[in-house]
Every structure is written in structure tokens, then in C-alpha cells.
């Protein structure tokens, strides 16, 4: 499924052709299906095949029938578990509202009713910190212990920026879905815009494609 999704994004010109990961790659993951009770959750513990019961921090309560879990190690060395479940989603009340969305650089999104979602230009201080950390990393000898420590520092700053961006996009996409029955959004060729170096940073930062994806799957949920 992950490979199919990667090729789908590639053919839509949203990313490069998928490449198989080396074992040396700091990002590794695997998915295992639920079979005969091999996956279970009890409080702050999760039972996983071959690992048994281990402690984990839940971001939310897990409801529904477990289908599979994916274990992933991110660039900073942290491990995450994603749990796919089958559950019923309660439909939202009808609002009889239709809305159009324009996205841009000055403001992240402007609705046809005048509602504006500002582009917060996430974490300028973190960006400066990231640039400094990357400069230090470039001066380290690749593969050495000091290089690896600095690589982890860079990865953690990237994580903070990514997490904050995801939180923002989830917040506004959920708000729009809950308040409007029909939603229209312009079709943007982000990959073409990314060829313009002056726009690349801003577009990457506000993540229009990710926002559109969230709207699409949340609309299907409800």
C-alpha cells in the first residue's frame, strides 16, 4: 500500500519516483496485520508480534476493530506506531452551506464568505535554528559520532516544524468540513510552482497539497 501511494503521488507529479530504502536509512518501517489476537491494547501498553507487551504513549483513544499496525522509526531515532482500525464515523449535521476556497502566499486560505486563515509562516526562529544546525552538520565528518549527534538535532527541529504544520492544517480543515456541506477548491499544480525558487519555501511551508488531501478524506468520513 505504501509503495502504491508513493507511485500515485509520483504519477501526479507530487514527488519523485519511489526508491527502496537502504538498511542504513534512519527511517525504517514495517506493517503487520491483526491475526488471532496478535495485536492488543491495554491502557498504556500495546501487544505487538515478536515484541510482546511494550509501553507506549497514546495520542488518542483507540476505538474500533484493529486491522493492522505500522511501526516506524523516524530520522531522530524515535519509534511510532500507527494503528489502522475499522469504525463507524457519525455523520455531521447538515449546514446547507456551500463554500469556495482560494489558497495563496499572503494568506493561507480565503473562503468565499470572507473568512481568512492567515499563513502563520511557521516558526521563523526554528528556521533560523535549523539553518544554524545544518551549517554545523555540514562541517562534521560524515559517519562520525559528532556528525550523527548533530544529524539527530537537525531531525528533531524538522519534526517540530512538521508537527506544528500538521496541527494547523488539521485544525482548519476540520473546521471547514464541520461548517460546510459543499466545498470547492482550486486545482493547483504545486510542482510547477516549486520550480520557482522564490516561491518554493513558502509553498512547502503552507503545504497546499496536504491541506487538500485532508479536506478530501475528512469529507469522505463525514
State the predicted function of each range.
Residues 50, 58-65, 73-222:
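Positively charged, helix-rich recognition surfaces that bind polyanionic ligands
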Residues 1-74:
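Acidic carboxylate diad motif detector
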Amino acid at each position: 500500500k505504501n509503495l502504491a501511494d508513493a507511485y500515485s503521488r509520483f504519477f501526479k507529479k507530487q514527488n519523485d519516483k519511489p526508491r527502496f530504502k537502504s538498511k542504513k536509512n534512519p527511517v525504517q518501517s514495517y506493517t503487520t496485520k491483526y491475526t488471532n489476537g496478535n495485536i492488543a491494547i491495554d491502557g498504556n501498553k500495546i501487544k505487538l508480534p515478536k515484541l510482546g507487551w511494550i509501553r507506549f504513549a497514546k495520542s488518542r483513544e483507540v476505538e474500533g476493530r484493529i486491522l493492522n499496525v505500522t511501526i516506524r522509526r523516524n530520522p531522530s531515532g524515535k519509534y511510532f506506531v500507527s494503528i489502522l482500525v475499522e469504525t463507524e464515523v457519525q455523520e455531521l449535521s447538515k449546514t446547507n452551506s456551500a463554500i469556495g476556497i482560494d489558497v495563496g502566499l499572503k494568506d493561507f486560505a480565503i473562503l468565499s464568505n470572507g473568512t481568512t486563515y492567515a499563513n502563520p509562516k511557521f516558526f521563523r526562529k526554528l528556521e533560523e535554528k535549523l539553518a544554524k544546525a545544518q551549517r554545523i552538520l555540514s562541517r562534521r565528518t560524515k559517519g562520525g559520532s559528532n556528525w550523527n549527534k548533530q544529524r539527530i538535532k537537525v531531525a528533531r527541529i524538522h519534526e517540530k516544524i512538521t508537527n506544528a504544520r500538521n496541527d494547523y492544517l488539521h485544525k482548519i480543515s476540520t473546521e471547514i468540513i464541520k461548517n460546510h456541506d459543499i466545498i470547492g477548491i482550486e486545482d493547483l499544480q504545486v510542482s510547477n510552482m516549486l520550480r520557482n525558487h522564490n516561491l518554493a519555501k513558502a509553498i512547502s511551508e503552507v503545504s497546499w497539497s496536504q491541506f487538500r488531501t485532508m479536506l478530501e478524506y475528512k469529507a469522505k468520513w463525514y
